[in-house]
Amino acid sequence: MAEITAALVKELREKTDAGMMDCKKALQENNGDLEAAADWLRTKGLSKAAKKSDRAAAEGLVAGLVSADGKSGVLIELNAETDFVAKNEKFQDAARRIAATALVHEALETLHEAKTAEGEVVNDLVTGLIATIGENMRLRRSERLRVENGAVALYLHNVQGEGVARLGVLVALEGAGDQAVLKDVGRKIAMHVAGTPTPPLALNSSDLDPEAVAKEREIQTQTAMESGKPREIAEKMVEGRIRKWQEEVVLLKQPFVMNPDQTIEELIAETAKQAGGPVSVKGFVRFALGEGVEKKQDDFAAEVASMTSAS
């Protein structure tokens, strides 16, 4: 049997972030083979991962990347249980690697099974993180924007490391004019989407989710009816309020945060003159970390009781 040295144990710990005794046992079980021991730890971690799968993963990172030619951009959200993990170098590196892979594999379903540039399957990469870091994790979502002529701009807010943050926005501008102008304005619009008090729900009114429109109409109808106005006037009130709401949540109709006297639509018209050709917003993507994920509220008393009964 190969000698299990302290240096070998240390190397395996650095490679996997597993505990010292676990690393020693893994090396003993695999005759000192470092790679086999790492795989053994991962296999051991698989059973742990299953136990963690029901724990809410609402923290983590949003990773963003734009291709070298500036015509494609991607955002991914990699979740974990605590914000502490977001500062882990291995976690940040994994998020960046997944984002790079997502530039090629757009659909989330195919991304899970895709291989990174290093040859590791994305699902295996995430499972390995669960095993070594010890928290439930998941690749929650991924979205890519691409233009044939134009530029895709990226803005990351509350940055946690290179290419990773708590909020990310992509904006795609279509146009054959001055690309430097498109890139600059695209980034400014991305900053607008990140910072405006009312995050846009759609690019145009026609792109709004019919369910969201129906819900808003129901709310405004109820409010108008309770006002005691005649039905005809109430109906006009509803239509007026729906139009106002659409102006608030449609990107092109929103006042530009850097110049509230100008709408995004007017900014695009101005940009076309600067760029020397027609410009249009092809699309935008906004990922805010953990949005829509129900976070588990810890019951401290129950936790103490559980620890007491277990001791």
Curated annotation (Swiss-Prot):
It comes from the Bacteria. Keywords: Cytoplasm, Elongation factor, Protein biosynthesis. One of its GO terms (cellular component) is cytoplasm. The keyword NAD does not apply. Residues 82-85 are annotated as: Involved in Mg(2+) ion dislocation from EF-Tu. GO terms for molecular function: translation elongation factor activity. The keyword Manganese does not apply. CDD domains: UBA_EF-Ts. Belongs to the EF-Ts family. HAMAP family: EF_Ts. PANTHER family: ELONGATION FACTOR TS, ELONGATION FACTOR TS, MITOCHONDRIAL. This is Elongation factor Ts. It comes from Phenylobacterium zucineum (strain HLK1).
